[in-house]
């Protein structure tokens, strides 16, 4: 082998899954590489080393934790298989994804890292015990379980909420075909603190507790959550003319079933109203109130310790939106929802650290007009 020539990873290889096995695959010429190699730490260290072009001598020096002969042999095998190739090789058609990702190496690296997961076979009790339960015991000996409760910065108690707001307190659609049909079913319900409370009770409030293995007592809510982690927080943005509550910004305090007022300027209140109503179909309607959903990542990441634990958080958020939509349709409310919230604006106004808690979505209820999105 030429130890001066520079080599690089053939980035058209992708990690694919079949059942519980992982394998490397290149779609251009339908080349697949053995699944077993993806469990080899040296393989991935070599892969990382050759993400940028380098000579074989340089790579051996970089991987000094390994025996040089072992590294050289592994590199030679990866070169022979086509996983590593000489820089400037032009004798094949490159995967378009390589070009698309050439300007975002961090995204490509993240994809690689998040693909190196030692998947748990939940059909195998021994695998669950070894990779899940025993690992949680180890983590608990070193770390504290993140709390399910959070009190927002710069907030103070404002409105204690009733644990039950009966649906019969409002006009409501008692026919599923009316509530969920194509025809609009607006009802003359006045927007009020009671309506806000009812929606919170179905989407955010604690209903019970559950004991989980190792991590102890956790919350139950009207929405399911992966591992009972419930990472989604609610910030309530209230406009004018909402009965029983002052215009302003509030954080829903789950522990005390309470709205805590957050002290912000009127210009910041307007900024949050606009941020939650970012889509054209929402901007064109009178603002009533909105739930801005944020996520405290640590809650889920403590339990699901892999780079793609964001999927569990998105499942949770989807369930929350579903419950909000169901309740709003039954009440005949005019609403909009969006996952296009301008995070930087929300995080700035609410003084959130985006590495700990970030804006995810918004659910907006409009005043007076009779239209559902």
Curated annotation (Swiss-Prot):
One of its GO terms (molecular function) is oxidoreductase activity. The keyword Protease does not apply. It is found in: Cytoplasm. GO terms for cellular component: cytoplasm. To E.coli McbC which is involved in the processing of microcin B17 (MCCB17). The actions of the proteins TfxB, TfxD and TfxF are implicated in the processing of the inactive trifolitoxin (TfxA) precursor into the active peptide. This is Trifolitoxin-processing protein TfxB. The gene is tfxB.
């Amino acid at each position: 082998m030429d130890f001066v020539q520079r080599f690089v990873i053939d980035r058209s290889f992708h990690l694919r899954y079949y059942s519980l096995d992982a394998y490397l695959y290149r779609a251009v010429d339908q080349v697949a590489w053995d699944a077993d190699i993806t469990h080899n730490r040296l393989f991935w260290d070599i892969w990382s080393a050759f993400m940028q072009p380098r000579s074989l001598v340089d790579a051996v020096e970089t991987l000094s934790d390994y025996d040089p002969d072992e590294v050289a042999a592994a590199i030679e095998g990866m070169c022979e298989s086509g996983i590593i190739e000489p820089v400037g090789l032009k004798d094949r058609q490159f995967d378009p994804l390589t070009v698309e990702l050439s300007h975002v190496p961090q995204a490509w690296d993240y994809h690689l890292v998040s693909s190196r997961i030692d998947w748990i076979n939940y059909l195998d009790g021994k695998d669950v015990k070894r990779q899940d339960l025993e690992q949680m015991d180890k983590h608990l000996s070193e770390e504290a379980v993140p709390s399910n409760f959070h009190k927002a910065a710069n907030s103070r108690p404002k409105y204690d909420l009733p644990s039950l707001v009966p649906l019969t307190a409002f006009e409501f659609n008692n026919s599923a075909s009316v509530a969920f049909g194509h025809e609009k079913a607006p009802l003359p319900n006045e927007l009020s603190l009671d309506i806000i409370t009812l929606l919170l009770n179905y989407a955010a409030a604690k209903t019970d507790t559950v004991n989980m293995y190792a991590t102890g007592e956790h919350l139950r809510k009207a929405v399911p959550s992966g591992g009972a982690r419930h990472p989604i927080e609610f910030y309530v943005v209230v406009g004018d003319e909402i009965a029983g509550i002052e215009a302003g910004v509030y954080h829903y305090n789950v522990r005390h079933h309470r709205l805590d007022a957050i002290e912000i300027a009127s210009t910041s209140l307007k900024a949050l109203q606009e941020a939650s109503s970012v889509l054209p179909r929402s901007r064109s309607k009178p603002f009533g109130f909105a739930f801005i959903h944020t996520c405290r990542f640590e809650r889920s990441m403590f339990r699901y310790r892999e780079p793609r634990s964001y999927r569990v958080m998105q499942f949770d958020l989807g369930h929350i939106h579903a419950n909000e939509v169901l309740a709003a349709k039954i009440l005949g409310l005019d609403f909009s929802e969006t996952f296009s919230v301008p995070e930087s604006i929300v995080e700035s106004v609410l003084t959130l650290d985006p590495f700990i808690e970030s804006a995810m979505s918004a659910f907006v209820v409009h005043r007076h007009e009779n239209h559902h999105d």
